[in-house]
Amino acid sequence: MFYLLNSIIMNDVPTPYGMYFQDSATPNQEGILELHDNIMFYLFIILGLVSWLLFTIVRTYSKNPIAYKYIKHGQTIEIIWTIFPAVILLIIAFPSFILLYLCDEVISPAMTIKAIGLQWYWKYEYSDFINDNGETVEFESYVIPEDLLEDGQLRLLDTDTSVVVPVDTHIRFVVTAADVIHDFAVPSLGIKIDAAPGRLNQVSALIQREGVFYGQCSEICGQSHSAMPIKIEAVSLPAFLEWLNEQ
């Protein structure tokens, strides 16, 4: 009981009526959360200011309908409401551009995983590792049907095989598709990238804690679009090497 009270419980799955992001597990997602919170601060200030101005104008006009009849323009107020929003937009845009660049930058990956979207499952290739038969480690990942789910497994999220990766390792995901456009998205890792036929897109992740992270195809791709979950297990390096030796 004492251990449970002193443990940090992370939310890495979608929750009913959820109103916020899943907990972050990578620096990129942490930056996205921080940017969102900062922007919301300015948005609430703008909402309050605009609401107050609207209320004041409506109240004043209702008391004296001809109060502003002969006012054609106000140079000072026009300058203010032109410059002030421009400054706010710059304050919001500058850090967002920095974050966008950092999310797009792939920094010296220690390993590469290729994710291929197909109707309606994912195929993964660990191109840096070769098994005893001289073949690249690869496997397919299918959603577990609802009637085969075990206790603790999640409907439309759990898969028969998981992508296993080590923590604190720069990982590059190379994403493509074999038929139609899919989308490789894992919210807790800050990953969302298109999987397009004939095109290779890449995104990086530095997972900073162990856990199981779920994602889904985020591009409508046909009848069973909802049956393309993504399950990534982040484990310690020794556990990853042990899993790799079993492949």
Swiss-Prot record:
UniProt EC number: 7.1.1.9
Q: Which residues lie on this side of the membrane: Mitochondrial matrix?
A: 60-78
Keyword Transmembrane carried by entry:
yes
Task: Supply the PROSITE patterns for this chain.
Answer: COX2 (PS00078), COX2_CUA (PS50857), COX2_TM (PS50999)
Query: Major place of localization?
Result: mitochondrion
Q: Which UniProt keywords apply?
A: Copper, Electron transport, Magnesium, Membrane, Metal-binding, Mitochondrion, Mitochondrion inner membrane, Respiratory chain, Signal, Translocase, Transmembrane, Transmembrane helix, Transport
Q: Which residues form the signal peptide?
A: 1-11
InterPro entries attached here? CcO_II, CcO_II-like_C, CcO_II_C, Copper_CuA, Cupredoxin, Cyt_c_oxidase_su2, Cyt_c_oxidase_su2_TM_dom, Cyt_c_oxidase_su2_TM_sf
Where in or outside the cell it occurs: the entry states:
Mitochondrion inner membrane
Organism superkingdom: Eukaryota
Its GO CC terms?
A: mitochondrial inner membrane
Q: One MF term in GO for this entry?
A: cytochrome-c oxidase activity
Task: Report how it sits in the membrane.
Answer: Multi-pass membrane protein
According to UniProt, the name of this protein is: Cytochrome c oxidase subunit 2
